[in-house]
Design a protein with these regions (language model features):
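Catalytic core of non-heme Fe(II) oxygenases with the double-stranded beta-helix
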Residues: 66, 70-189
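Non-heme Fe(II)/2-oxoglutarate
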Residues: 1-85, 101
Length: 189
């Protein structure tokens, strides 16, 4: 039987992308008419609900970036999670303006999200360019604090199981940019 001996749920790596790569991705979003993000899952059609999720997004298909993401997903999965993962889902660049947020949720569920195994979020913004916008997880951190908060360093990546409850707290000043994608495989159940 395969076990997760370290019981890690959130993996963080600094300098996944350079500052110039982050800026290039932020500019890509601004040049490509972002759309309002929808809620996905157990619905007949995806829906928009700004009370739950308020941000914009644009998809990006960059082979070099996709390969780099896949390689890190596979390394983290081999070392820690040990899931059956097979393919990278669409990569999206997200923009959260003042008031932007995403309340507590998971990234896996029914229908098209049922095959999501791992989530990756890359911090594109400089952490001093916005206030609020913390990526929080519904797990206790090493200090005993109830919600673990991910690091906000530009270019860093955070990988975690898609079933792990998380949120982005409301932006109170500035703009937060991030990149998100998922590694998919056969559903857990």
């Amino acid at each position: 039987m395969i076990t997760n001996d370290t019981f890690e749920f959130v993996v963080h790596k600094e300098n996944f992308l350079s500052e110039s790569q982050c800026v290039k991705l932020m500019r890509y979003l601004e040049r490509n008419e972002p759309t309002i993000s929808e809620l996905a899952g157990n619905y007949d059609n995806n829906i928009m609900n700004k009370e739950v999720r308020d941000n914009q997004e644009v998809k990006i298909n960059d082979e070099k970036l996709n390969n780099k993401l896949k390689m890190l997903f596979e390394l983290a999965n081999h070392s820690i999670f040990k899931y059956n993962i097979q393919e990278l889902e669409s990569v999206k660049i997200l923009k959260y303006g003042v008031g932007g947020k995403y309340k507590w949720h998971t990234d896996s569920g029914a229908k098209e999200t049922s095959t999501r195994k791992l989530t990756a979020i890359v911090q594109l913004s400089d952490e001093t360019n916005y206030e609020g916008g913390d990526l929080e997880f519904g797990i206790t951190d090493e200090t005993g604090k109830n919600n673990y908060t991910a690091k906000r360093t530009r270019g860093s990546i955070t990988i975690f199981p898609a079933f792990l409850s998380h949120r982005v707290t409301p932006i109170t000043q500035g703009t937060r940019y991030s990149l998100i994608t998922w590694m998919n495989g056969d559903c857990f159940v």
